[in-house]
Amino acid sequence: MTEAKPTRRNAIAMLGAGASATATLGSSPALAQATARPFVLVHGSWHGGWCWRRVADLLDAKGHKVYTPTLTGLGERSHLMSGMITLDTHITDVANVIKWENLQDVVLVGHSYAGFVISGVAERVQPAISSIVFLDAFLPQNGECVLDLTPPDLHAATLAAVAKNEVGRPVPPAKAFNVNEKDQAWVDSKLTPQPTFASLTPIVLTGAREKIAKKTYIRATSYPNPRFDGYLEKLKQDPAWRTYGVPSGHDVMVDMPDRLSEILLEVA
């Protein structure tokens, strides 16, 4: 049998096919999307979705879809502040993002107060969540409310607000969270009062949080908080949890967005 000699046209076609195959393997949108994950990042008291911008940009650059909902009555939704806002309102805010966006395989992250929020969200949409992350956050048990777990100064401030029927708890300075000096003015300009009665709502938990496959606790070690230290030490002994300590103030997403993004990708 005589072997056919390659023609110039065949050579060009072969080169084109090879380049196309390389492009498909190296930069296929379908391939990139196969590993993309939805991240839902939930802020804590006095904050808003704005505080996640640096982390969201880093995760987005890696091809992930990122949602940073602002809870009712805070941030750009501060005009909705009222005495009717409870913890359940905030749980609904986040659960509805997951429901209405039809999200699955969610990495759900809650900062500080939002440890209550994401624990409640797990009760409503647990099958949609594959990884839950508590970022320097409360880890509540059934029947607890935020007021039960707050440090003495914040406990007193909340009771004073309730006594005066104030719908919003006063804003502390960013310095109180040990935010780095460069970002303190920016954070101060964004903080808004925290809905008072959200701190009084007991949470109802039936164990949905514990059914989530991946569970992580991240402690900001430069922010003194004995309760959070206790969570970390307890969870270090639990093989169902991954734990991290980062040398940051309370607002890790502001102070150390690069390191936080790395951890979130590790535990996704």
Task: Cite the ranges covered by each PLM segment.
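C-terminal segment of N-terminal export signals and the immediately downstream linker at the start
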Residues: 25-44
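Catalytic active-site module of serine/aspartate enzymes centered on a nucleophile-bearing elbow/loop
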Residues: 244-268
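Conserved hydrolase catalytic core segment
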Residues: 107-141
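N-terminal export signals
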Residues: 2-5, 10-31
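Active-site loop/oxyanion-hole signature of alpha/beta-hydrolase fold enzymes
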Residues: 73-106, 123-124, 148-150
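Conserved alpha/beta-hydrolase
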Residues: 60-78
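Flexible "cap/lid" loop of the alpha/beta hydrolase fold
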Residues: 133-165, 227
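Conserved loop-alpha-helix segment in the C-terminal half of the alpha/beta-hydrolase fold
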Residues: 221-247, 254
